[in-house]
């Protein structure tokens, strides 16, 4: 929807259709890695200072058990996809006898076309797995226990933090990384 509004106000950006999604995905990966760093810090603090009993020796593997492993997946996925994309675009530019910075928008799109095709093929699987994820969470959740523990207030705090803090950080990160990206592609 945002992309449609931007393209409606700025028709000259039409060649960049899809860049907002790419920027959003990259920002999401950065934010998830940032969350992973804080999750690691919290795991260390929790293991060594909050749950540690006097005289008890804490094993370092306990931090590994508490660390959210999905962060490693995000990081590796980001690095692998960035490397593959860069290698493919560099190879395409080399086959034309030019540097990547000399590629026109059409040539850049042609170099990126195999990745766009792969993403289009994976979109149906992405939707299915996304639905299965939330279905699974709903199936295994015992909401009566959550209600009894008073986690409704925690959900309210999360909601307030999300809209009062987290979204603004995401917007700031997006702006810092992507505010002039369209200028790179509109030659």
UniProtKB/Swiss-Prot annotation:
It is a multi-pass membrane protein. It is found in: Cell membrane. Keywords: Cell membrane, Membrane, Transmembrane, Transmembrane helix. InterPro entries: UPF0324_pro. It comes from the Archaea. The chain crosses the membrane at residues 29-50, 70-92, 128-147, 154-176. Coiled coil: none annotated. The keyword Hydrolase does not apply. One of its GO terms (cellular component) is plasma membrane. PANTHER family: INNER MEMBRANE PROTEIN YEIH-RELATED, UPF0324 MEMBRANE PROTEIN FN0533. This is Uncharacterized protein AF_1618. It comes from Archaeoglobus fulgidus (strain ATCC 49558 / DSM 4304 / JCM 9628 / NBRC 100126 / VC-16).
């Amino acid at each position: 929807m945002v992309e449609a509004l931007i393209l409606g106000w700025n028709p000259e950006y039409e060649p960049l259709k899809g860049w907002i999604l790419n920027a959003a995905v990259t920002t999401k990966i950065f934010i998830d890695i940032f969350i992973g760093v804080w999750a690691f810090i919290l795991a260390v603090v929790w293991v060594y200072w909050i749950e540690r009993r006097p005289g008890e020796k804490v094993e370092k593997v306990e931090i590994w058990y508490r660390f959210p492993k999905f962060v490693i997946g995000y990081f590796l996925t980001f690095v692998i996809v960035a490397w593959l994309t860069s290698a493919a675009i560099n190879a395409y530019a080399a086959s034309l006898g030019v540097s990547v910075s000399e590629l026109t928008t059409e040539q850049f799109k042609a170099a990126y076309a195999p990745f766009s095709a792969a993403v289009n093929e994976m979109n149906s699987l992405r939707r299915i797995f996304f639905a299965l994820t939330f279905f699974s969470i709903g199936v295994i959740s015992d909401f009566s226990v959550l209600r009894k523990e008073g986690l409704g207030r925690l959900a309210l705090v999360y909601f307030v933090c999300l809209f009062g803090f987290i979204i603004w950080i995401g917007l700031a990160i997006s702006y810092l990384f992507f505010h002039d990206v369209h200028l790179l592609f509109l030659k």
